[in-house]
Amino acid sequence: MSTWTGKRVAVLYGGRSSEREVSLRTGAACAEALRQKGHDVVLVDVDLEVAARLRAERVEVAFVALHGRWGEDGSIQGLLESMAIPYTGSGVLASAMGMDKTVSKAIFRSLGLAVADYRVFPRAAAGAIGVDDLPFGLPCVVKPAGEGSSVGVHLVNAAAELGPACRDAAGYAGDVIVERYVKGTEVDVAVLEGKALGAIEIVPANAFYDYAAKYTAGTTKYFYPARIPEAHVRAVMEAAEAAHRGIGCSGVTRVDFIVAADGTPYILEVNTLPGMTATSLVPKIAAGLGLSFPDLCDRILDGAALKA
């Protein structure tokens, strides 16, 4: 029996970030899964009145399914701490550090993890970024520092593409990060309660695993377990656990990598609130271990707590 059986569970979803649509799908799926496990669930679309809604619904525990700003940056976690409502996932500080790629990349390097060369530019300077500003040259990847789900991310192969890519990334949250493109196999690792569950290989139909490839069914192939040497699998799972611990994460995370031909796992980011939709990777990995989606959600809920 779950710790929270018989308690009023709020699944927090939606919000107003660029990842709202993904969050709506994640929240709906998780709410249904928790109901299948017998929980008393209310869905709460997060807005400026969320605190009043939580009080009115007499919520006793929160299942956070809120992607992007407000949900993954520590904001909703801070509110829940102040209301003394236990919640799933990482706390305020870990969420904020995981969401800010500039901060998390520095932490990864301090842990001795492999990080592709990169440069950080203020949003105001994005329109003036040129190839001469990049010691690693092209190809490169441009991304906003404070977004997830590959929102605003571009693979740049030619100098003429760099300016438009940087200007687009500057329209989102945070500074603009430009990093060296690493050729290799895209591998994501699910970590639950500090333990790596498994590594899944991602093969998008196009050259780049962008937002459409992540959330459009049939556009990407997944292979579990990942089709890389066993030694490389062990290395990437160990790196994922180190990143999870280093950021100070709780509950479930998804850690994204590019594994180079020599087996070096270049870490891209830690997702403190990974997607939980029909096409999401954490449920795929869990299913490969025989853990059903309702059971996975129940495990995540069971770890709900105040972190401060």
UniProtKB/Swiss-Prot annotation:
Residue sites binding Mg(2+) 2 per the record: 269, 271
This protein's pathway: Cell wall biogenesis; peptidoglycan biosynthesis
Residues that hold Mg(2+) 1 according to the record: 256, 269
Residues engaged in binding ATP: 133-188
Ranges for domain ATP-grasp: 105-302
InterPro entries noted in UniProt: ATP-grasp (IPR011761), ATP_grasp_subdomain_1 (IPR013815), D-Ala_lig_Van_CS (IPR000291), D_ala_D_ala (IPR005905), Dala_Dala_lig_C (IPR011095), Dala_Dala_lig_N (IPR011127), PreATP-grasp_dom_sf (IPR016185)
UniProt keyword Cell wall biogenesis/degradation, yes or no: yes
Cofactors required: Mg(2+); Mn(2+)
Cofactor binding note from Swiss-Prot or TrEMBL: Binds 2 magnesium or manganese ions per subunit.
Subcellular location: Cytoplasm
Single GO term (MF): ATP binding
UniProtKB keywords: ATP-binding, Cell shape, Cell wall biogenesis/degradation, Cytoplasm, Ligase, Magnesium, Manganese, Metal-binding, Nucleotide-binding, Peptidoglycan synthesis
GO process annotations (BP): cell wall organization; peptidoglycan biosynthetic process; regulation of cell shape
EC number from the UniProt entry: 6.3.2.4
Reactions this protein catalyses: 2 D-alanine + ATP = D-alanyl-D-alanine + ADP + phosphate + H(+)
Any one Pfam family match given in the protein's UniProt record, by short name: Dala_Dala_lig_C
Superkingdom, taxonomy of origin: Bacteria
A GO cellular component annotation in the UniProt record: cytoplasm
Cross-referenced HAMAP family: Dala_Dala_lig
Family: Belongs to the D-alanine--D-alanine ligase family.
Cited function: Cell wall formation.
Xref: NCBIfam families: D_ala_D_alaTIGR (TIGR01205), PRK01372.1 (NF002378)
Name of the protein described by the UniProt record: D-alanine--D-alanine ligase
Gene: ddl
